[in-house]
Amino acid sequence: MLGRSLTSVLIVPTGIGCAVGGYAGDALPLARAIASVSDRLITHPNVMNGASLYWPLPNVAYVEGYALDRFAAGDWQLQPVHCNRIGLLLDAAIEPELRIRHQQVAEAAQATLGLSVTAAVITDAPLGVTLRQADSGSTWGTIDRPDSLLRAADQLLKAGCEAIAVIARFPDDPGAIALQDYRQGQGVDPLAGAEAVISHLIVREFQVPCAHAPALQPLPLDASISPRSAAEELGHTFLPCVLAGLSRAPRYRSATESIAESIRPESVDVVIAPETAIGGPGILHWAARGIPILAVAENRSTLDLRPVDLGVPVQHLQTHLEAVGWLAAYKAGLDPAALSPGDRRLSYLNHSVQQATSG
């Protein structure tokens, strides 16, 4: 094939209540559409994870959020793999029955999907996850024992694991208003912000693929829940999608290494993100290098930070359908503006020539 292949990046930040991507796997249809018009799509677990539901896409790189920022900064490159040996990291706070449920998911993934889940470890202390919510509505969280988390991760890596699936015990509060709103398709995922903190710690320390699945007791049956949150009502764990994603997640390598067929930071051609969430470090790095940023207005969030507030140049698009069309035109070698009505006149850099022409 002649010409450059199209590498797209899709970012939907977690914990800010995005209209698309703020729930359990509800950004997967968007990822599938973008992947279909791209040669390669790079995205993160919040986009691809749907609890018990997932959709393997051969041209999608599953990259943890902190790693994505380091990649955008030019510090890391991505090394595609055939498969990863996955290690299971379980919080000591998980009750025995709930731990067995997660163990069964890992064993089922080996038996039915052929994944390589090679070792498991229980932390030497309860991790102590605490959930928080900012005044804006965005969620975040902390863990009391990051040292225990990192020691357990180190054990798995020394045992030959190449990617880590973390299962931390999250607080149960089925009566919480925030949780009830989320189940009804309103508000913000109360778990999302804390999940990101856990995976960031491991990736920052060890530079390996990592994703998180919270351990919770099953919620009471509610026939009125929103379809957008329904994926989290299935089964006993959120682990299946994490194992599927990590199984072929690219490994993280220093950008200074010489690696054949790696995905280099300069490979990125275009970035798609919610219009109110383009202030993250990754997007700012890409924008500074002149990479087109497609800011989608319909993907609202709890944030109210516009591109103009940050001085970030973007392509303002109303819908994700418009973004998919923009990508298709761009891949075909067209100026996407050529598909809209109106005159596009040539602009002279020499001001006097411009005046003479217009006069």
Swiss-Prot record:
Taxonomy, superkingdom: Bacteria
Keyword Nucleotide-binding annotated: no
Name used for this protein in its record: Uncharacterized lipoprotein syc1174_c
Matching InterPro entries: DUF3326
Recorded coiled-coil stretches: none
Pfam families per the UniProt record, alphabetical: DUF3326
The species this protein was found in: Synechococcus sp. (strain ATCC 27144 / PCC 6301 / SAUG 1402/1) (Anacystis nidulans)
Coarse class of the protein's main subcellular location: membrane
Signal sequence, renumbered to the chain: 1-17
Lipidation (N-palmitoyl cysteine): C18
UniProt keyword terms in alphabetical order: Cell membrane, Lipoprotein, Membrane, Palmitate, Signal
